[in-house]
């Protein structure tokens, strides 16, 4: 895979008008937050943007500003498809018909397994989250950030770092989080509460089924649970 090119991505964002954004199957906070942050920012500079979540809005992230602008099905053919937080082309959560007109595929991701499937790639495995890359992209491209966009970025970064508990929490990650909180007055405690405490009945039932499979070995250092297709 070629080296990531900020300039190529920025050129695409500046040159074209019609964008469709998507992320991986069963999206998490980083995928959804990255889609919202980049999509809302492009909207603010007059671009036509469609943010697609075919599986609908996960209850956990229903609080995010702009989430109501996402759609489950595309309504137009884009000039550019922006893939966020998706390591493989096959996992990109977008209908195949969007590719029939050969739009430019831009791949923005942080997974080390990403093979650079886009025509333009911005893949940074050292980044803790795709939201971290999107933040840097918005700054480099001089694209706007406001409170809703900052909330999406913070949620993206916080969820992929375990709210700054994982080993991928670097000084840059903490610096970005601090900027988002200080400059846009976003509420970290409320975001953490919504992410960790908002659960659908279906997710709670699934958790109960998985916990019911818990087994502990004779050696108490080992325990395991399992999740199978029937549970989901």
What do the PLM-derived regions correspond to, one by one?
Residues 2-25, 31-62, 77-80, 159-232:
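Hydrophobic helix-and-loop "lid/oligomerization" segment in the mid-to-C-terminal part
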Residues 3-8, 87-88, 137-140:
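Short, motif-level signal for alpha-helix interfacial/capping segments enriched in acidic residues
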Residues 108-178:
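Short alpha-helices
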Residues 12-13, 74-75, 97-100, 114-115, ...:
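Solvent-exposed alpha-helices and their adjacent loops that cap or buttress functional pockets
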Residues 38-39, 98-101, 123-124, 175:
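Glycine-rich, phosphate-binding/catalytic loops in enzymes
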Residues 1-7, 98-105, 125-134:
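An acidic intrinsically disordered interaction segment
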Residues 65-120:
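Active-site cofactor/cluster-binding pocket
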């Amino acid at each position: 895979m070629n080296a990531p090119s900020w300039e190529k991505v920025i050129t695409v964002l500046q040159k074209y008008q019609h964008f469709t954004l998507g992320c991986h199957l069963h999206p998490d906070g980083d995928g959804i937050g990255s889609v919202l942050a980049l999509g809302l920012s492009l909207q603010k500079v007059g671009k036509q943007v469609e943010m697609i979540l075919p599986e609908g809005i996960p209850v956990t992230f229903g609080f995010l500003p702009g989430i109501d602008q996402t759609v489950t099905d595309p309504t137009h053919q884009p000039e550019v498809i922006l893939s966020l937080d998706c390591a493989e082309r096959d996992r990109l959560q977008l209908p195949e018909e969007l590719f029939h007109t050969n739009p430019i595929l831009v791949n923005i991701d942080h997974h080390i397994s990403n093979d650079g499937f886009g025509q333009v790639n911005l893949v940074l495995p050292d980044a803790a989250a795709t939201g971290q890359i999107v933040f840097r992209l918005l700054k480099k491209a001089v694209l706007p950030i406001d409170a809703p966009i900052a909330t999406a970025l913070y949620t993206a970064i916080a969820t992929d770092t375990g709210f700054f508990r994982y080993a991928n929490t670097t000084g840059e990650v903490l610096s970005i989080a601090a900027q988002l909180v200080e400059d846009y007055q976003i509420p970290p405690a409320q975001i953490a509460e919504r992410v960790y405490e908002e659960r659908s009945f279906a997710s709670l039932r699934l958790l109960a089924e998985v916990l019911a499979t818990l087994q502990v070995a004779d050696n108490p250092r080992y325990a395991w649970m399992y999740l199978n297709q029937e549970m989901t």
